[in-house]
Amino acid sequence: MNSPDRFAAISDIHGNLHALEAVLARIRSMADIEITVNLGDILSGPIEPAATADLLISLDLPTIRGNHERQLLDCARAPGGASDQFAFEETTASHRSWIAALPATLPLGEDVLLSHGTPHDDLEYLLETVTPGGCRLASGEEVASRLGAVRRSLILCGHSHVPRAVSLADGTLVVNPGSVGIQAYTADQPFPHEIANGSPHARFAVCERGPHGWSVSQHMVAYDWDRAAETAQRHGRPDWASRLLSGRNEA
């Protein structure tokens, strides 16, 4: 696949069909978007995983898998976490075959690379560092170290849900478009930490090649988060419902 000159990036949908539809509508309204790419963590969550899969399969976007795709498929062998297990039980064998065929990384031409976490590990944040004291933004040196020998003009990642762009010393631009589906969560590994973007808006990014290199614009989209939260509540996840409404982790 050739590298596009202007494209949208989405990530971490987590089965939130309402947010995804709003983001895709916004992207369609924008001029000269050649493609939309999807950076993984697609279905796991207590909202509408099957309908989300149906929509994305029909669109046939360039898509990679995230850690939650692995975890969802692992539910065939043993019960998984609540979000993965719910998505596994709601989806069909056809949906899961689609997930299983997704690549871990995907190049767009010679100068753009799609990854979920780092290019080597879908569970490791690329642009954040987790310590015993919590989560902080990673330094340029930390980002470069996690990339190892991988270099492109533009590298896209997801996983952390935090919209951010970092320019490295060698000119590489690393972009996280943020999360379409959920703006706050807590995690236990490698140390307990939390992420909270502070508003419920769905996030995506637009990357554009110019005469002096790549530029990025980050976007926030309002959608019917009340409906998404009601669905999560109905599926027994008041924790998700609260986060969907606020973009924060407190009750």
Language-model features: locations:
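A short acidic, glycine-rich active-site loop
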Residues: Q85-E90, P132-E141, E194-N197
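Core catalytic region of metal-dependent phosphoesterases/phosphodiesterases
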Residues: S3-A100
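Acidic, His/Gly-rich catalytic cores of divalent-metal-dependent hydrolytic chemistry
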Residues: N2, S167-A251
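Redox-cofactor binding/interface segments in oxidoreductases and associated redox assembly factors
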Residues: N38, C157, N176
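Active-site environment of divalent metal-dependent phosphoester hydrolases
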Residues: H14-H18, S44-I47, H68-D74, P107, ...
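His/acidic metal-ligating clusters that form di-metal
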Residues: M30-D32, S94-V166
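Structural motif
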Residues: I35, P62, V112, L154, ...
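Active-site-proximal beta-strand elements of phosphoester/diester hydrolases
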Residues: D5-H14, D111-H120, V174-P177
